[in-house]
Amino acid sequence: MSSKKHLEVQRWINKAKSDLRVARMAFNDSVPEYSLACYLSQQCAEKSLKALLIWLDVRFLYKHQLDYLVELLPPDYQRLFEEMDIEWLSDWVTEGRYPGDYPEATRDDAQKAINMAEKIFTLANEILVL
């Protein structure tokens, strides 16, 4: 991997790691922000997948839908994400940031989102072996 590509992949992974860290902080705060934790978990997953796509030299549109990003992966990598509720996590990119007709995130939602983000982040890092 070229040093330029390595640096770009590392930048995306570092941002994903920061999003996950702050999602945990929002979840564990004395006044928890569950919607924010869900949004940041989605962001962690998105950035982890985009780092993987950059590493694989797969071009992608700057979209937030995680299922779109997973579909761009080679089939062997897609299988790693099959059991995850990727579409559910994708929804938090909007539901977690804006008021609207969405139900407020619950503690269970936030825990599920963080767990999914951790799995996606870990899988991406295991594949990348940076």
Report each predicted region and the residues it spans:
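Terminal alpha-helical segments
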Residues: M1-L130
